[in-house]
Amino acid sequence: MMEVTFLGTSSAVPSKNRNHTSIALRIPGEIFLFDCGEGTQRQMALAGISPMKVTRIFITHLHGDHILGIPGMIQSMGFRGREEPLDIYGPPGIHELHECIMKMGYFTLDFDINVHEVRGGTVVEEDDYRVTSAPASHSVFNLAYCFEEKKRPRFLREKAIALGLKPGPAFGKLHRGIPVRVGDRIIMPEEVLGSPRKGVKVCYSGDTRPCESVIKLAEGAELLIHESTLEAGSEDKAAESGHSTAREAAEVARSAGVKRLILTHLSTRYKRTEVILEAARQVFPVTDVADDLMTVEVKAYDSSPDS
């Protein structure tokens, strides 16, 4: 199961209802953070997400509302006795930011922090997923990120149940290619796996104007998370500041052929999101506006009967 939790959905200034930007992506065995604005670890506590389970942090750009939660996050990990390494990815300047963080306070860490400077292309390559990136169009260098599962066999649930398996951890093991014992019998993965299916794809724009690089990166994604700092009619202001309106974000979603669009990074000047949502849905109907602590499950879009 894959879940996306919106820890913070405000733009440059937080409000009573919206924290600075951060998004948690939960996949089996790992949690990724995309951006880490001020107050992120408190939002994680409210969402029931442990910082100790975060394996990777992906930073889109170095504006304060996207990075100022990192020092506290690292310190809390140290206080709690973390030993597992943490990987941080970001644009040029991310190394200097990390060095500054380590100098500005008292840190006693028993874990390694691996910092990776990213300019685009493949960021992480694992057996079952990859993370890619592309430069977007903001007032400073900004990276859009895309998480994508690699193709894997469909899990034949009904066949597994017929073999005596109950829904639970055994299903996950078999889907990952691990044999499972049921009574005195060992069930092999190939007994309950079908033909390969497309993996889930999730794309996050960071702060950006509508641009071809994000459209290309997000092509065919199950979910596009796109900034919507300004409402429709504010295109000139959005262009000046390197941001997008709700309608522009919807046009990106339509051009990329994504399945669902969720808008985030909302200006505090807008108290009601209905106007933003209406403008976006006129262009791309499958649109929602994120709220803090909102969680959505993301599944692969596959109409095959054995999926």
From Swiss-Prot:
Record's keyword terms, sorted: Endonuclease, Hydrolase, Metal-binding, Nuclease, tRNA processing, Zinc
Binding annotation for Zn(2+) 1: 61, 63, 138, 207
Coiled-coil regions listed in the entry: none
Molecular function per GO: 3'-tRNA processing endoribonuclease activity; zinc ion binding
Cofactor: record remark: Binds 2 Zn(2+) ions.
Cofactor: Zn(2+)
Pfam families: Lactamase_B, Lactamase_B_2
UniProt xrefs under SUPFAM superfamilies: Metallo-hydrolase/oxidoreductase (SSF56281)
Top-rank lineage group of the source organism: Archaea
Enzyme nomenclature, EC number: 3.1.26.11
Catalytic activity: Endonucleolytic cleavage of RNA, removing extra 3' nucleotides from tRNA precursor, generating 3' termini of tRNAs. A 3'-hydroxy group is left at the tRNA terminus and a 5'-phosphoryl group is left at the trailer molecule
Positions that bind Zn(2+) 2: 65-66, 207, 265
Residues of the active site: 65 (proton acceptor)
Enzyme class per UniProt: hydrolase
InterPro entries associated with the record: Metallo-B-lactamas, RibonucZ/Hydroxyglut_hydro, RNase_Z/BN
Family, per entry: Belongs to the RNase Z family.
Function: Zinc phosphodiesterase, which displays some tRNA 3'-processing endonuclease activity. Probably involved in tRNA maturation, by removing a 3'-trailer from precursor tRNA.
Subunit structure, interactors included: Homodimer.
The protein's name: Ribonuclease Z
Originating organism: Methanothermobacter thermautotrophicus (strain ATCC 29096 / DSM 1053 / JCM 10044 / NBRC 100330 / Delta H) (Methanobacterium thermoautotrophicum)
